[in-house]
Amino acid sequence: MISRERVLKTIEHQEPDRVPLDISAVDEVMDALIDYYDIQVEEEEESKLYMGADGNIFERKRNKAQLLLLEKLHIDFRWAWAPYIGPELQIYPDGSRDGLFGIKRGGLFFGYALEHPLREAKTIEDIEAYPWGKYTNLDHYDYDHYAEECRQFNEEGYAVYGGPWAPISFWAMDLMGMDNFMISLYDCPEVASTLVNKTSDFFYQQAKIMFEKGKGMTDIFFMGDDYGVQNGLMFSKQIWRKFFAPHLERLWKLAKSYNFKIQLHSCGSVKELIPDFIKKGLDVLDPIQVGARGMVPEELKKEFGREIAFHGSMDTQKTLPFGNPEEVKSEVFHRFKTMSLGGGFILSPSQHLLTEIPLKNIATMYETAYEYGWYPDVYKL
């Protein structure tokens, strides 16, 4: 069974030949794993600039080696990306650089917003006056390269992720500053709504281009927007339904028109929103942050497992960073025993793998999952 068949079958709540595997990790960890497995390439391709999930523009230098690493770990998914090809972005002495929407970003791993250009915005006019056209030019991305990656990965039999990451609320917070934006949701809802419309419209228009370019070669629209924290939702369910749900629904309807599956990354405790996600057409929920309130994987499987698939759940807060290889192996077994019945489960970390996690634990997770994750033997663990 090829990876695409394996993934789509499990999303449809059927048992494939084995539990599908995926990975999410910062580039520093990917590079360390490349060295851990002594993966060599004769000639690395020319580096390209990519817009990361957070909008940080970063340079990917070891793309060929990363693809070989994915093969080594038996990863069933591949991402297709549209490299940034717009005007040269200013790089500052501290290593930070300008990113999407004109936000200066820098810092570890994903990068953080160092400035909030709409922090002082108080009116709709303030939002409209921002030079959106300068920072949201859809022609600044190489969609032909994106289409070629979709074609390549599709022909190789992988499940292909396509479309923009589309973190709608994330960007509104970075533009205005999280504190100001959260206050505006209550005190100036028309201003907050206008800002969210701006971020959503950019990603919707970009999605239309990417979906068309990847038509027939893309399997899953995987987007991310965080609505939870460790102990609950970031804002009330009513606020989420008013300000963000309509934009998700619009994007998901577009993706469904291309026959794509929908996968959402939303950190933290989001159990309260899962019924809404399902009603709006979500197929797969990621990353199942197991340490957050209400996110016990087997309980989610029991309550929602007939209607939605789960992606993630290998604990990056406790087991992977602080456990030993035997504890990692035990958690893989536990996930298989409690989550894989009837399909609907993809094993992956519960958040991005960071450099604090021992490489031996990461290797143990994937080696164990591949060795023992075959149906029907998975039930004998």
Each language-model region and where it sits:
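Segments that shape or occlude catalytic/ligand-binding pockets
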Residues: 32-87
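N-terminal catalytic cores of secreted or lumenal carbohydrate-active enzymes
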Residues: 78-90, 96-99, 136-137, 151
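Active-site loop segments of alpha/beta catalytic cores
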Residues: 1-44, 59, 98, 103-381
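Feature targets compositionally biased, intrinsically disordered low-complexity regions
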Residues: 51-54, 94, 110, 132
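A generic hydrophobic-helix recognition signal that picks specific residues
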Residues: 67, 92-95, 170
